[in-house]
Amino acid sequence: MRWLLLLCLAMAGSAPAAAGGKGWHFVRGSFEPGRGPDGNSVFLDAPEGLILVDTGRHPGHQEKLLAYAHARGKPVAAIVNTHWHLDHSGGNAEIRAAFPNAEVHAGTAVDGALAGFFPNSRKAAEEFLASGKASPELAAEIKRDFAAMDDVGSLKATRPVTRSGEVRVAGRRLQLNLAPFAATEGDVWIYDPDEKLLIAGDLVVGPVPFFDTGCPEGWRKALAELESRPFETLIPGHGAPMTKPQFLRWRTAFGNLLDCAATDREKAECVAAWKRDAAAFIPADDRRIDEMVAYYLDSRLRAPPAERGKYCRPLR
């Protein structure tokens, strides 16, 4: 899994932050040294309570989410998972333990992950634990991930998202959109026309796109769909909220990276081009970017065709 790569890098932490608009509240995820990330979370006010988009991975992140809900005096009436990666869905069980009536709106791609990706990742993680190289804190995190993988009922949707369309979630009108074969086999992204708010999940990741389960060209198409909405604020899966002009800049950087990967330019040139094009979204003290972009060039963008297209078809 991605943490096996990232925990080997010189990691720079980012402090969690919270902000929002009139009808929504943003809780920023974190990526602290020596552990995996938490994705961003967003609360939306709804007639029946609160809608929570993505639940993070770590107990500390979930404590912030629960504290906000309790401070508001409202139940979490619905969870929307943008995708099945555990830094976005790993807290489902904890949130639903506190709010057992919360429905889970999510895609069905987790079925393929449960059948193949999770078992394969678990095997690698078990070998890492057996090596004795994991710190006690990291070992505890890996075991929490195992527990999340085993709790199938918390990862699966009670309200599956199988196509794009307008729905009412906890009484609030939202557009739940399904992007096939992009950052994952099925990415759910949310557009709130009343707030002009777009919640992108890992279709947009500020510092560098995570291609671990990505289909590059499908992802490029999904970004065009995002651009078609008249949003004013976009919440990425990781990183700070963006205006539409900022998103367009990020989308250009994404396209340039794919285009560079398709040429015979040196890998270092493609890495440098990403760092230049996406400079506004990369923290100045983050030393992970060179290794991460190089890794994704080797493992996905310039991999042999079968590997490059591995996640451009169903995992099941």
Summary of predicted features, one role per range:
Residues 44, 54, 69, 83, ...:
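Divalent metal-coordination and catalytic microenvironments
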Residues 12-21:
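Boundary at the C-terminal end of the N-terminal hydrophobic targeting segment
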Residues 60-106, 227-232:
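Active-site metal-binding motif and surrounding structural segment of the metallo-beta-lactamase
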Residues 4-12:
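Bacterial N-terminal signal peptides
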Residues 136, 140-142, 227-233, 241-316:
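Accessory terminal helices/loops
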